Amino acid sequence: MTGDPALPPAAIRRITTAVIARELRRLRDEDIGQSKAAETVGHETTDPLALDSLETMGVATALGAVFQQDDLSFAPDTPATSADWAARIATRPIERLTVYTSGATGRPQPHAHTIADLLAEAHELARQFARTRRVVALVPADHLYGLIWTALLPAILDVPVIAGTVLTLPAPAAGDLIVGVPEHWAALARLGKPWPADVTGISSGGALPAALGEDLIAAGLTRLVDVYGSSETGAIGLREVPAIGYTLLSRWQLTSAADTATLVDREGQPVSLPDDIRPIDERRIELLGRRDHAVQVGGINVYPDRIAAVLGECAGVASAVVRLGDHGRLKAFIVPAGEPDEAALEQQLRQFVAARLAPVERPTSFRFGAELPRNPMGKPADWR
């Protein structure tokens, strides 16, 4: 093989379609609710996109940022399909792709990855999932997880991609690789549909509850693989449910000082991880929890302590604590100030969070009590 590695045309088309869909939602101020957990994945279409001049500029700028093409000259002069945009992009050298961190607060941070690194990761995954006949994408390809698993991987395996949602999921078939986030898998588990043999599920973008994974396997899903990584690093390790350990991809190595649980890349550079980890052996790690105390809702980082502080600013609230619930959304426990009507206070809180917090930050359930939940040792405890 000679020359630099190149992005497959099919991958360029899928990434382009997803970036255009995301940018048009932003420009048109559409409410996408739970983002990656609820959005409709962009589909390639043969119909020209109805863009005005400002939308054309916005789409060109967004694509230029992702594909690192600095000017807007690749923007078509006439109404064009997403495939037309992709074809223009493909005529130029693409050495890196830029992806963005997810977060409900703060500005998403860009992270550039070389095409060589992205393709190396996708080829390694292709070897591990070589029996795949079709990729079913419940996530778009405008973030690193979706880009690798639903754009690069199927292009390398030369298999079709079916994009959809939980409600429009095609009938699963042997050889399917279904790519989603924990909220998708929770919804599929609730639907209770039977799984045919030889269907593999992939999950990332948040913690996959152990009970959920076990329920899906018990219902007949052949494999469920939890992916650990970040927008900064790409995939770091894979965990076969119900195991607790993540097997490192070949790019990553544990340092000899195992007690510090430090990872280095193939160049020997240490990697800053969002989680504390514990080595199980030379190639497997266990996650011990986020260092920044963030949790993920729909693949987006949110911060329960910050949200609890905001709830504490609501009139009638003495103190509050926020946790991630079993259903993948946030829940709040409230200690009222005085003895207010709890139903009225809950209504007030829902109006308050709608005005102050992003959709993914808003607790969907509220419990009330005279004091915050604690265990017999006096430490913060969960509640039902």
Predicted regions span which residues?
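Phosphopantetheine-dependent thiolation modules in NRPS/PKS and related acyl-activating systems
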Residues: 1-97, 379-384
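Conserved S/T- and glycine-rich ATP-binding loop of Class I adenylate-forming
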Residues: 63, 101-104, 135, 178, ...
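Conserved adenylation A10 loop of the ANL superfamily
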Residues: 98-110, 231-232
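AMP-binding/adenylate-forming
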Residues: 112-125, 134-188, 200
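Gly/Ser/Thr-rich phosphate-binding loop
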Residues: 190-243
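AMP-binding/adenylate-forming core of the ANL superfamily
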Residues: 252-279, 283-286, 335
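AMP-binding/adenylate-forming catalytic core of the ANL superfamily
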Residues: 275-361
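Conserved C-terminal "lid"/linker of ANL adenylate-forming enzymes
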Residues: 295, 352-384
